[in-house]
Design a protein with these regions (language model features):
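Membrane-water interface at the C-terminal end of transmembrane alpha helices
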Residues: 22-25, 89-92, 142-160
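Hydrophobic alpha-helical membrane segments
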Residues: 81-85, 103-119, 139-145
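Hydrophobic transmembrane alpha-helical segments in integral membrane proteins
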Residues: 1-21
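Core segments of alpha-helical transmembrane spans in multipass integral membrane proteins
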Residues: 43-57, 73-90
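Membrane-helix boundary connector in multi-pass membrane proteins
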Residues: 93-103, 115-133
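Membrane-interface helix-boundary motifs at transmembrane edges
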Residues: 27-41, 94-100, 127-128, 158-159
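Individual transmembrane alpha-helices with interfacial aromatic-anchor signatures
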Residues: 6-9, 130-142
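Short juxtamembrane and helix-loop transition motifs at transmembrane-helix boundaries
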Residues: 3-6, 37-41, 61-71
Length: 160
């Protein structure tokens, strides 16, 4: 079980992006950018963040060694933020554009903070290369989400 949770949370692009793309094709409502945004909220940002939360809460020793960190109480704050983002993303899957946009802002702020922290740790030699790979994957997912929301809004504005 730990290997599955570890793989899901460390490789979000490899695992969840193909699932999200296939799922977006089979969604029947909305434009293509809307379907892509909803699928991204459901899989990498919803289920992926819940897997990251489970890893932080239940497998903290393995998580800390993977990231090169000492065990500390701060990890539980990260786990709660992962839980919040995961739940908000699952809700965004079925909610309005405004709710999706608010959830995307939450994702950008939270994951952007993680990105900056890991980059600084990596540059200081405190984090292994594996944790740096996840930054690129998360950055790609954030850019894909931003693009899908922009095109969703443009399509929506064109219909009004």
């Amino acid at each position: 079980m730990i290997e599955l949770i570890r793989y899901l949370s460390v490789n979000p692009v490899l695992v969840f992006l193909p699932i999200a793309l296939v799922f977006a094709i089979f969604l029947r409502t909305g434009s293509a950018p809307e379907r892509l945004a909803r699928a991204l909220f459901l899989f990498p940002f919803g289920i992926g963040r819940l897997a990251a939360c489970a890893r932080v809460f239940f497998f903290y020793e393995e998580t800390n060694s993977l990231l090169g960190l000492d065990p500390e109480h701060f990890q539980y704050k990260i786990g709660l933020a992962d839980l919040g983002l995961g739940i908000a993303s699952l809700l965004a899957f079925r909610k309005s554009f405004s709710f999706c946009l608010g959830t995307a802002v939450f994702a950008f702020i939270f994951l952007g903070g993680i990105w900056i922290g890991r980059l600084l740790n990596f540059l200081a030699g405190l984090s292994p290369v594996e944790s740096f790979w996840t930054l690129g994957a998360k950055s790609f997912l954030l850019l894909l989400l931003a693009a899908s929301l922009i095109f969703w809004h443009r399509k929506k504005a064109g219909k009004a």
